[in-house]
Amino acid sequence: MQCSWKAVILLALVSIAIQYTAIRTFTAKPFHICPVPNPLNCGLGQDVESFDRMCDEYPYFNYNSSRKTHILILATTRSGSSFVGQLFNQHSDVFYLFEPLYHVQTTLIPHLSPSRYAVERRVMLGASRDLLRSLYNCDLYFLESYIKPQPANHTTDKLFRRGASKALCSMPVCDAFSPNDGNIEEGDCVRKCASLNLTLATESCRERRHVAIKTVRIPEVNDLKALIEDPRLNLKVIQLVRDPRGILSSRIETFRDTYRLWRIWRATGRKPYNLDLTQLTTVCDDFLNSVSTGLSRPPWLRGRYMLVRYEDLARNPLQKTKEVYEFLGLSLEKGVVDWIHNNTRGNNDVSAKHKYGTLRDSAANAESWRLKLSHDIVDYTQTVCQHILDELGYKAVNSPEELKNMSISLIEDKTFIPFL
């Protein structure tokens, strides 16, 4: 009973915080009642011009779907999403943000359970959708409610992984680098650029035709339905999936404390009695729910959803990138092609030691988990994740010898055609 009362009080406090954030956002800006044009008339210049004149003071309408394509990379931790994010970050007309929902999570739910209890999940998703809507409309001031300490004069040095966004390390946001500098290292950006001015960041966002956001904090595409159905956002979702066995292996190597019991199992061959199995089952359940929705082709996902396997991208990065860009209606720039050539061939010692690195031998990395996981862990994973493994075309192994035989691929040739 005592825990129940604590849960009720916590939910009430979080709800008040969200409402306060929303009210403060509305009251901080002038309110306009703007007539929304009929989408069928978007090609009629006079109507659109009149609409813009009436609403030019209101950024939500001033940066609508007639001008921008918005992209969301829907992924889970250690699935290759940082690599995919760079495919958009390198495009000169894309404003890219790396995990802005991190701030929502750390502010509202500092102790979010890996199993994502229903109450916490609803709170997190509601706030996340509100923030995404604002960011896609280049309202970066909305972030200030979640950044701690709160920015002063719209300036902060606490934006998570600011250096992972090329737009936030370039003019007009930062003048430390010239346009000819090419690839800007994340650490160099953080060291050489001054604190982030959100007003200049907003200006940079509005100058670009596309906004791309990467997140591992939205469990399923179903959770994005309200945003996808909003015609003003013109949102398209790239769902990135990876073999759950590879995800588990990467997490064991990267998050050593959190996955300590998995490491014990791998080393001793004995499964700890108190192992948190939700660290595996949550990934498979979320994948299955989301992919099942996407592949069932509901009307609200027509032209809005593309499923991409990390392994396909790793084995043929340029061809897969071309397919993704074609689906999104983006031109494949030379800078993106050059980045792919430079960052998917051969090992990179510096990046290999960094848990969030994107420079790697992508083809070799796709199935390297087979040399790191024990067969008993793999066998258990195949049992609890059988349905999603079958759905995505990942083959099971039946012996330690088969697991370590790298001459036999565990990835079926399977094509996932976008729903157009």
UniProtKB/Swiss-Prot annotation:
One of its GO terms (biological process) is keratan sulfate proteoglycan metabolic process. It is an enzyme of class 2 (transferase). GO terms for molecular function: keratan sulfotransferase activity; N-acetylglucosamine 6-O-sulfotransferase activity. Residues 1 are cytoplasmic. Its EC number is 2.8.2.21. The chain crosses the membrane at residues 2-23. SUPFAM superfamilies: P-loop containing nucleoside triphosphate hydrolases. It holds the Pfam family Sulfotransfer_1. The keyword Cell inner membrane does not apply. Glycans are attached at N64, N153, N197, N342, N405. Keywords: Carbohydrate metabolism, Glycoprotein, Golgi apparatus, Membrane, Signal-anchor, Transferase, Transmembrane, Transmembrane helix. It comes from the Eukaryota. It is found in: Golgi apparatus membrane. Coiled coil: none annotated. 3'-phosphoadenylyl sulfate binds at residues 77-83, 242-250. It is a single-pass type II membrane protein. Residues 24-420 are lumenal. It catalyses: 3'-phosphoadenylyl sulfate + keratan = adenosine 3',5'-bisphosphate + keratan 6'-sulfate. GO terms for cellular component: Golgi membrane. Sulfotransferase that utilizes 3'-phospho-5'-adenylyl sulfate (PAPS) as sulfonate donor to catalyze the transfer of sulfate to position 6 of galactose (Gal) residues of keratan. PANTHER family: CARBOHYDRATE SULFOTRANSFERASE, CARBOHYDRATE SULFOTRANSFERASE 1. Belongs to the sulfotransferase 1 family. Gal/GlcNAc/GalNAc subfamily. This is Carbohydrate sulfotransferase 1. It comes from Danio rerio (Zebrafish). The lineage of its organism: Eukaryota, Metazoa, Chordata, Craniata, Vertebrata.
